[in-house]
Amino acid sequence: MHFWWTAISAGLLCLPQALGRSDSPNYTVEELWKLETTFWDNFLYPANVEQMEAINSTLFTPDVQGRVDITRVFNGSELNTEYIFGLFSDPDHVSLVGVPVDYSIVQFIAQGNIASATTVVTFNATSFGNLLIPVTIDTWIMWDSNGQIVQYDATFRWFGFLLDTLVETLAASINGTTSEATAALTQLLATTICATHDQYCTGANQQYDNNTACYDFLTTAIPLGKDYELGRNTLLCREVHEHMVQYDPALHCPHIGPTGGDYCVDDQTYAQKVLQKYFNQSWIVGVPSTGDIWLGD
Protein backbone atom coordinates (compact mmCIF):
# COMPACT_ATOMS: atom_id res chain seq x y z
CA MET A 1 0.00 0.00 0.00
CA HIS A 2 2.82 2.37 0.90
CA PHE A 3 4.43 1.74 -2.50
CA TRP A 4 1.26 2.56 -4.43
CA TRP A 5 0.59 5.71 -2.39
CA THR A 6 4.16 6.88 -2.99
CA ALA A 7 3.79 6.25 -6.73
CA ILE A 8 0.45 8.09 -6.90
CA SER A 9 1.82 11.04 -4.93
CA ALA A 10 4.82 11.29 -7.23
CA GLY A 11 2.50 11.20 -10.23
CA LEU A 12 0.36 13.99 -8.83
CA LEU A 13 3.43 16.13 -8.22
CA CYS A 14 4.43 15.70 -11.85
CA LEU A 15 0.92 16.32 -13.17
CA PRO A 16 1.15 20.12 -13.56
CA GLN A 17 4.22 19.76 -15.76
CA ALA A 18 2.59 17.02 -17.79
CA LEU A 19 -0.59 18.98 -18.35
CA GLY A 20 0.80 22.41 -19.12
CA ARG A 21 3.81 24.66 -19.51
CA SER A 22 5.73 24.53 -16.23
CA ASP A 23 7.50 27.81 -17.01
CA SER A 24 4.28 29.76 -17.56
CA PRO A 25 3.20 32.25 -14.87
CA ASN A 26 0.28 31.29 -12.68
CA TYR A 27 -1.70 34.48 -12.16
CA THR A 28 -4.73 34.78 -9.93
CA VAL A 29 -8.07 35.49 -11.60
CA GLU A 30 -7.95 39.00 -10.13
CA GLU A 31 -4.52 39.60 -11.65
CA LEU A 32 -5.68 38.36 -15.04
CA TRP A 33 -8.73 40.61 -14.83
CA LYS A 34 -6.41 43.55 -14.21
CA LEU A 35 -4.23 42.60 -17.17
CA GLU A 36 -7.35 42.29 -19.34
CA THR A 37 -8.76 45.67 -18.33
CA THR A 38 -5.35 47.32 -18.72
CA PHE A 39 -5.33 46.23 -22.35
CA TRP A 40 -8.82 47.57 -23.02
CA ASP A 41 -8.14 50.81 -21.15
CA ASN A 42 -5.25 51.42 -23.54
CA PHE A 43 -7.31 50.35 -26.55
CA LEU A 44 -9.67 53.29 -26.06
CA TYR A 45 -9.11 56.67 -27.68
CA PRO A 46 -7.08 58.73 -26.84
CA ALA A 47 -4.99 56.30 -24.74
CA ASN A 48 -4.34 54.31 -27.93
CA VAL A 49 -2.60 57.34 -29.42
CA GLU A 50 0.05 57.16 -26.69
CA GLN A 51 0.51 53.44 -27.34
CA MET A 52 0.84 54.09 -31.07
CA GLU A 53 3.42 56.82 -30.55
CA ALA A 54 5.53 54.37 -28.54
CA ILE A 55 6.13 52.47 -31.83
CA ASN A 56 6.58 49.22 -29.88
CA SER A 57 3.91 49.09 -27.19
CA THR A 58 5.20 47.62 -23.94
CA LEU A 59 1.88 45.82 -23.57
CA PHE A 60 3.28 43.30 -26.08
CA THR A 61 6.34 41.08 -25.99
CA PRO A 62 8.76 41.82 -28.85
CA ASP A 63 7.77 38.60 -30.64
CA VAL A 64 4.03 38.71 -29.90
CA GLN A 65 1.74 36.71 -32.16
CA GLY A 66 -1.74 37.93 -33.01
CA ARG A 67 -4.63 36.71 -35.13
CA VAL A 68 -7.83 38.54 -36.06
CA ASP A 69 -10.48 36.46 -37.77
CA ILE A 70 -11.62 39.06 -40.32
CA THR A 71 -8.07 40.03 -41.31
CA ARG A 72 -4.93 37.96 -40.81
CA VAL A 73 -2.08 37.17 -38.45
CA PHE A 74 0.27 39.87 -37.15
CA ASN A 75 3.79 39.18 -35.87
CA GLY A 76 5.94 41.33 -33.59
CA SER A 77 5.27 44.26 -31.30
CA GLU A 78 5.69 47.01 -33.89
CA LEU A 79 3.19 45.54 -36.34
CA ASN A 80 0.70 44.75 -33.58
CA THR A 81 1.08 48.23 -32.11
CA GLU A 82 0.20 49.71 -35.50
CA TYR A 83 -2.81 47.50 -36.15
CA ILE A 84 -4.26 47.21 -32.66
CA PHE A 85 -3.77 50.81 -31.55
CA GLY A 86 -2.96 52.87 -34.65
CA LEU A 87 -5.89 51.62 -36.71
CA PHE A 88 -8.43 53.24 -34.38
CA SER A 89 -6.57 56.35 -33.23
CA ASP A 90 -7.59 59.17 -35.60
CA PRO A 91 -11.19 60.42 -35.36
CA ASP A 92 -10.63 62.89 -38.21
CA HIS A 93 -9.58 60.27 -40.75
CA VAL A 94 -12.00 58.28 -42.90
CA SER A 95 -12.52 54.82 -41.40
CA LEU A 96 -15.17 52.15 -41.01
CA VAL A 97 -15.74 52.19 -37.26
CA GLY A 98 -13.87 55.28 -36.11
CA VAL A 99 -12.42 55.35 -32.60
CA PRO A 100 -13.21 53.23 -29.50
CA VAL A 101 -14.61 55.35 -26.67
CA ASP A 102 -15.94 52.85 -24.12
CA TYR A 103 -16.04 49.14 -23.35
CA SER A 104 -17.80 46.59 -21.18
CA ILE A 105 -16.47 43.10 -20.54
CA VAL A 106 -19.54 40.85 -20.54
CA GLN A 107 -17.90 37.41 -20.40
CA PHE A 108 -14.64 36.51 -18.69
CA ILE A 109 -12.92 33.35 -17.55
CA ALA A 110 -9.24 32.95 -16.76
CA GLN A 111 -6.65 30.49 -15.53
CA GLY A 112 -2.86 30.45 -15.31
CA ASN A 113 -1.72 33.07 -17.81
CA ILE A 114 -4.69 32.93 -20.19
CA ALA A 115 -7.96 34.83 -20.22
CA SER A 116 -10.93 34.38 -22.53
CA ALA A 117 -13.29 37.33 -22.70
CA THR A 118 -16.10 38.91 -24.66
CA THR A 119 -15.95 42.68 -24.74
CA VAL A 120 -18.54 45.07 -26.16
CA VAL A 121 -16.61 48.09 -27.39
CA THR A 122 -18.46 51.29 -28.24
CA PHE A 123 -17.01 52.98 -31.30
CA ASN A 124 -17.67 56.50 -32.47
CA ALA A 125 -17.98 55.97 -36.22
CA THR A 126 -16.92 59.51 -37.07
CA SER A 127 -17.16 58.91 -40.83
CA PHE A 128 -20.82 57.96 -40.42
CA GLY A 129 -22.14 61.03 -38.65
CA ASN A 130 -20.59 60.20 -35.26
CA LEU A 131 -22.69 57.07 -35.01
CA LEU A 132 -22.10 55.34 -31.68
CA ILE A 133 -22.05 51.66 -32.47
CA PRO A 134 -21.37 48.64 -30.23
CA VAL A 135 -18.89 46.08 -31.55
CA THR A 136 -18.55 42.68 -29.90
CA ILE A 137 -15.00 41.32 -29.79
CA ASP A 138 -14.15 37.85 -28.47
CA THR A 139 -10.55 37.47 -27.32
CA TRP A 140 -8.14 34.89 -26.00
CA ILE A 141 -5.06 36.55 -24.53
CA MET A 142 -1.91 35.00 -23.07
CA TRP A 143 0.58 36.94 -20.91
CA ASP A 144 4.16 36.26 -19.85
CA SER A 145 5.60 36.70 -16.35
CA ASN A 146 6.13 40.43 -17.01
CA GLY A 147 2.47 40.98 -17.78
CA GLN A 148 3.12 41.42 -21.50
CA ILE A 149 0.94 39.84 -24.16
CA VAL A 150 2.63 36.81 -25.73
CA GLN A 151 -0.17 35.95 -28.13
CA TYR A 152 -3.82 36.74 -28.75
CA ASP A 153 -6.68 35.48 -30.87
CA ALA A 154 -9.52 37.91 -31.64
CA THR A 155 -12.89 37.47 -33.32
CA PHE A 156 -15.27 40.25 -34.36
CA ARG A 157 -18.70 38.82 -33.67
CA TRP A 158 -21.57 39.75 -36.05
CA PHE A 159 -19.22 41.80 -38.23
CA GLY A 160 -21.35 41.27 -41.34
CA PHE A 161 -24.32 42.74 -39.50
CA LEU A 162 -22.11 45.67 -38.50
CA LEU A 163 -21.08 46.37 -42.10
CA ASP A 164 -24.71 46.24 -43.23
CA THR A 165 -25.65 48.69 -40.47
CA LEU A 166 -22.96 51.13 -41.56
CA VAL A 167 -24.14 50.96 -45.17
CA GLU A 168 -27.76 51.48 -44.08
CA THR A 169 -26.70 54.48 -42.01
CA LEU A 170 -24.91 55.94 -45.01
CA ALA A 171 -27.95 55.27 -47.22
CA ALA A 172 -30.16 57.20 -44.82
CA SER A 173 -27.72 60.12 -44.70
CA ILE A 174 -27.65 60.46 -48.50
CA ASN A 175 -31.34 59.60 -48.86
CA GLY A 176 -30.41 56.78 -51.19
CA THR A 177 -30.70 53.05 -51.64
CA THR A 178 -28.39 50.42 -50.21
CA SER A 179 -26.78 50.02 -53.62
CA GLU A 180 -26.19 53.75 -53.87
CA ALA A 181 -24.72 53.81 -50.37
CA THR A 182 -22.40 50.91 -51.21
CA ALA A 183 -21.22 52.78 -54.30
CA ALA A 184 -20.71 55.94 -52.24
CA LEU A 185 -18.71 54.01 -49.64
CA THR A 186 -16.58 52.46 -52.36
CA GLN A 187 -15.83 55.89 -53.82
CA LEU A 188 -15.06 57.38 -50.40
CA LEU A 189 -12.66 54.62 -49.42
CA ALA A 190 -10.94 54.60 -52.80
CA THR A 191 -10.49 58.38 -52.77
CA THR A 192 -9.00 58.23 -49.28
CA ILE A 193 -6.62 55.38 -50.11
CA CYS A 194 -5.42 57.08 -53.28
CA ALA A 195 -4.80 60.35 -51.43
CA THR A 196 -2.71 58.46 -48.89
CA HIS A 197 -0.84 56.74 -51.69
CA ASP A 198 -0.08 60.06 -53.38
CA GLN A 199 1.24 61.51 -50.13
CA TYR A 200 3.32 58.65 -48.76
CA CYS A 201 3.96 56.08 -51.50
CA THR A 202 6.56 57.89 -53.54
CA GLY A 203 9.78 56.85 -55.21
CA ALA A 204 10.49 53.16 -54.72
CA ASN A 205 7.27 52.81 -52.72
CA GLN A 206 4.98 54.00 -55.53
CA GLN A 207 2.30 51.45 -56.43
CA TYR A 208 0.17 53.24 -59.05
CA ASP A 209 1.16 55.39 -62.03
CA ASN A 210 -1.16 58.18 -60.92
CA ASN A 211 -4.25 58.97 -58.88
CA THR A 212 -6.62 58.02 -61.68
CA ALA A 213 -5.02 54.60 -62.10
CA CYS A 214 -5.30 54.08 -58.35
CA TYR A 215 -8.97 55.05 -58.22
CA ASP A 216 -9.88 52.96 -61.27
CA PHE A 217 -8.21 49.87 -59.84
CA LEU A 218 -9.83 50.20 -56.42
CA THR A 219 -13.32 50.84 -57.78
CA THR A 220 -13.43 48.46 -60.74
CA ALA A 221 -10.72 45.78 -60.56
CA ILE A 222 -11.41 44.43 -57.07
CA PRO A 223 -14.58 43.96 -55.00
CA LEU A 224 -15.47 46.01 -51.95
CA GLY A 225 -15.29 42.77 -49.99
CA LYS A 226 -17.41 40.70 -47.66
CA ASP A 227 -17.26 40.73 -43.87
CA TYR A 228 -14.60 37.98 -43.77
CA GLU A 229 -12.45 39.46 -46.54
CA LEU A 230 -10.50 42.19 -44.75
CA GLY A 231 -7.43 40.04 -45.29
CA ARG A 232 -8.06 39.26 -48.95
CA ASN A 233 -7.82 41.01 -52.33
CA THR A 234 -10.52 43.58 -51.60
CA LEU A 235 -11.05 47.30 -51.09
CA LEU A 236 -11.94 46.72 -47.43
CA CYS A 237 -8.56 45.08 -46.84
CA ARG A 238 -6.77 48.03 -48.36
CA GLU A 239 -8.87 50.36 -46.21
CA VAL A 240 -7.47 48.62 -43.13
CA HIS A 241 -3.88 48.90 -44.28
CA GLU A 242 -4.24 52.47 -45.56
CA HIS A 243 -4.20 53.67 -41.96
CA MET A 244 -0.74 52.15 -41.45
CA VAL A 245 0.96 53.58 -44.53
CA GLN A 246 1.99 56.80 -42.79
CA TYR A 247 3.94 54.87 -40.15
CA ASP A 248 6.02 52.73 -42.49
CA PRO A 249 5.50 53.40 -46.22
CA ALA A 250 8.07 50.83 -47.33
CA LEU A 251 6.21 48.09 -45.49
CA HIS A 252 2.60 49.13 -46.01
CA CYS A 253 2.43 50.78 -49.45
CA PRO A 254 2.39 47.38 -51.20
CA HIS A 255 -0.63 46.42 -49.10
CA ILE A 256 -2.74 49.16 -50.69
CA GLY A 257 -1.29 48.60 -54.16
CA PRO A 258 -2.45 46.27 -56.95
CA THR A 259 -0.48 43.29 -55.62
CA GLY A 260 -1.85 43.63 -52.08
CA GLY A 261 1.58 42.85 -50.66
CA ASP A 262 1.48 39.87 -48.32
CA TYR A 263 -1.82 40.85 -46.71
CA CYS A 264 -4.50 41.76 -49.26
CA VAL A 265 -4.19 38.61 -51.35
CA ASP A 266 -6.31 35.56 -52.07
CA ASP A 267 -3.72 33.02 -50.98
CA GLN A 268 -5.83 30.88 -48.63
CA THR A 269 -8.77 28.60 -49.09
CA TYR A 270 -11.36 28.38 -46.35
CA ALA A 271 -9.85 25.14 -45.06
CA GLN A 272 -6.32 26.58 -45.09
CA LYS A 273 -7.43 29.53 -42.99
CA VAL A 274 -9.23 27.33 -40.47
CA LEU A 275 -6.38 24.84 -40.20
CA GLN A 276 -3.49 27.32 -40.29
CA LYS A 277 -0.68 26.27 -37.93
CA TYR A 278 0.33 29.50 -36.27
CA PHE A 279 0.58 29.83 -32.49
CA ASN A 280 3.76 28.91 -30.63
CA GLN A 281 1.90 27.99 -27.45
CA SER A 282 -1.30 26.04 -27.00
CA TRP A 283 -4.47 27.67 -25.71
CA ILE A 284 -5.49 24.43 -24.01
CA VAL A 285 -5.29 24.76 -20.24
CA GLY A 286 -5.07 22.01 -17.63
CA VAL A 287 -5.04 19.01 -19.97
CA PRO A 288 -2.45 17.63 -22.41
CA SER A 289 -2.33 19.67 -25.62
CA THR A 290 -0.96 16.86 -27.79
CA GLY A 291 -2.54 17.07 -31.22
CA ASP A 292 -3.38 20.79 -31.07
CA ILE A 293 -3.73 21.49 -34.81
CA TRP A 294 -3.21 25.26 -34.43
CA LEU A 295 0.30 24.95 -33.03
CA GLY A 296 2.98 26.09 -35.46
CA ASP A 297 5.46 23.65 -36.90
UniProtKB/Swiss-Prot annotation:
Residues 1-20 form the signal peptide. Keywords: Glycoprotein, Signal. Transmembrane segments: none annotated. Glycans are attached at N26, N56, N75, N124, N175, N210, N280. Belongs to the bfoA family. Part of the gene cluster that mediates the biosynthesis of bifonsecin B, a dimeric gamma-naphthopyrone. The first step in the biosynthesis of bifonsecin B is the production of gamma-naphthopyrone precursor YWA1 by the non-reducing polyketide synthase albA, via condensation of one acetyl-CoA starter unit with 6 malonyl-CoA units. This is Bifonsecin B biosynthesis cluster protein A. The lineage of its organism: Eukaryota, Fungi, Dikarya, Ascomycota, Pezizomycotina.
